Amino acid sequence: MGALGLEGRGGRLQGRGSLLLAVAGATSLVTLLLAVPITVLAVLALVPQDQGGLVTETADPGAQAQQGLGFQKLPEEEPETDLSPGLPAAHLIGAPLKGQGLGWETTKEQAFLTSGTQFSDAEGLALPQDGLYYLYCLVGYRGRAPPGGGDPQGRSVTLRSSLYRAGGAYGPGTPELLLEGAETVTPVLDPARRQGYGPLWYTSVGFGGLVQLRRGERVYVNISHPDMVDFARGKTFFGAVMVG
């Protein structure tokens, strides 16, 4: 009985010892398996890499610090630039010509010529390329009523302003009428004024429209009463702008 009891206890002790050894071994194995990938990941996180997997070398310590922290320098954006050519355009302002009536100013106040347009009082406005243009013209007029008496119809005056083109592909023939406007003015007489001219009157003739023009064609203005043109600021002008 005594011998058997000791033997049974010894067997149980040996079994418990084997179990403890097995548990300790398994724990060590799991710890080792977890430690290896964690160590590898930590090393990879500390090594600077570019997008292709190669380590980049820079002489700038600040750049090295940025790369080590995982920052990337973005490329600088170039400012947007409109490289398309400007459309031909012109705006001319009426100016008096000595002994010739109406002339045109190309540089003063709001007047301009752009993108190859040219102008001369002798030949008119020349446009540099074929296209659809919007042409416009406004001519201001002023005058005085004649002395009192007489037929009212005899006091009426018809003011006419026209745009013509000539030259270029159109040829050297007779100029072609493009656009025209007209206004008839009948000054009101002052019954009390029997002698001398009446008060000043003012009016304007304006028009505009789309015209297909070719390179080299010249556009000019023709008016019926150059001695009545109003040259005050903003009263008389003409121009063109390419729209297609």
Curated annotation (Swiss-Prot):
It is found in: Membrane. The chain crosses the membrane at residues 19-48. One of its GO terms (molecular function) is tumor necrosis factor receptor binding. Residues 88-243 form the THD domain. Its main location: membrane. InterPro entries: TNF (IPR006053), TNF_C (IPR002961), TNF_CS (IPR021184), TNF_dom (IPR006052), Tumour_necrosis_fac-like_dom (IPR008983). Residues 1-18 are cytoplasmic. Cytokine that binds to LTBR/TNFRSF3. May play a specific role in immune response regulation. Provides the membrane anchor for the attachment of the heterotrimeric complex to the cell surface. Isoform 2 is probably non-functional. This is Lymphotoxin-beta. It comes from Homo sapiens.
